């Protein structure tokens, strides 16, 4: 496989589960099976760390039966972290990515640029074809690459509301990613809260 670098604001937040740590069920069970079919680890790790599992909708027909497992959320996170740490060609780095680095494409012929754009190495930013060349961290580190995959979760300019009080933090008191949003907006990507 490709040499891959995973950035995380905290190594302790890898595969951190929410307050209701379920995997599977009626709405998401098919997603777990799709991830499993593609070689993913979600199903494997829940098999190692579940504390209870239940077949839902048993009183209905087999088409709607659905397995849901309740995870030991601490062990699930530790198992997933071990899995990533032992994956060949994968390096984990604890740092906050602040910027996506791009350069103008400057392709001699539009046909080549269109092919590269289709392959994911070019991106149109504010009407101009750009090539992604890397990322820059808050501490100033620059990491060159051929592709960037963003999985921001709930961390971009995260804030927790406790009554009237607003705390600018990620889940469970972890650091929020406060800088990447500006870079994404500068590249013409709209931000929305759901």
Task: List where the protein language model places each region.
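Short hydrophobic core segments
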Residues: 135, 142-153
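Conserved N-terminal/central alpha/beta ligand/cofactor-binding core
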Residues: 2-103, 111, 139, 151-171, ...
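Generic low-polarity alpha-helical segments
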Residues: 1, 120, 144-148
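Conserved beta-strand-loop-beta-strand element in the redox core of flavoprotein oxidoreductases
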Residues: 101-141
């Amino acid at each position: 496989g490709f040499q891959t670098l995973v950035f995380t604001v905290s190594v302790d937040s890898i595969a951190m589960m929410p307050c209701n740590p379920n995997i599977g069920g009626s709405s998401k069970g098919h997603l777990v099976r799709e991830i499993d079919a593609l070689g993913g680890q979600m199903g494997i790790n829940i098999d190692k760390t579940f504390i209870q599992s239940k077949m839902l909708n048993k009183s209905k027909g087999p088409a709607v039966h659905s397995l849901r497992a309740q995870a030991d959320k601490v062990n699930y996170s530790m198992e997933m972290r071990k899995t990533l740490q032992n994956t060949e060609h994968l390096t984990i780095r604890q740092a906050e990515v602040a910027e996506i680095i791009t350069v103008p494409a400057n392709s001699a012929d539009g046909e080549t640029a269109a092919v590269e754009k289709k392959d994911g190495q070019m991106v149109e930013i504010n009407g101009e074809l750009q090539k992604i060349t890397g990322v820059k961290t808050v501490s100033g580190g620059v990491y060159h690459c051929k592709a960037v995959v963003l999985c921001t979760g709930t961390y971009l300019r995260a804030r927790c509301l406790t009554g009237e009080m607003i705390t600018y933090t990620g889940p469970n008191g972890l650091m929020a990613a406060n800088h990447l949003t500006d870079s994404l907006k500068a590249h013409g990507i709209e931000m929305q809260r759901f």
